[in-house]
Amino acid sequence: TIALGFVLALVAALVLPSIGRFNIPELTVWLHVISGITWVGLLYYFNFVQVPAMGEALADEGGPGPAAIGKYIAPRALLWFRMSAAATWLTGAYALENVGGFVAAFMFAPGLQMIGLGAWLGTIMLFNVWVIIWPNQQKILGIKEASAEEIAKAKFTAAMASRTNVVL
């Protein structure tokens, strides 16, 4: 379905007369929006679907437990989560350079204050994903060896960073 979306966008870009020619800055913004939707969608999935489902699966004594989620779903979802976070930030950085400057936006230059705020929030969120959430999820999912105490701490830390991203 993602590939079909790209194909349809390419067809629209080639067919619609208003576009006229291939436009890298507009493509970058489009990719920024698509990757941002993917990132935030997965963020909401983790916070509002997977985390509560894991708790229910742990409490369900007669059920299959949370193993399938932890073994098959979470690693794949976390891969898309990390990659969409990186793609969102990188395409956003390129788009910022096209509208007045990457550094100017981060410095809240006149006319770039709101986009600069968004850039800072996105940067904090990216940091949370790669520096806090992902290393702790590796412990939780057994990708990185950790004691039971370290896993308990990792669950709390990852959850707080993820919830912070929901607020941002």
Residue ranges of predicted features:
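Polytopic transmembrane helical bundles with strong interfacial aromatic enrichment
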Residues: T1-L168
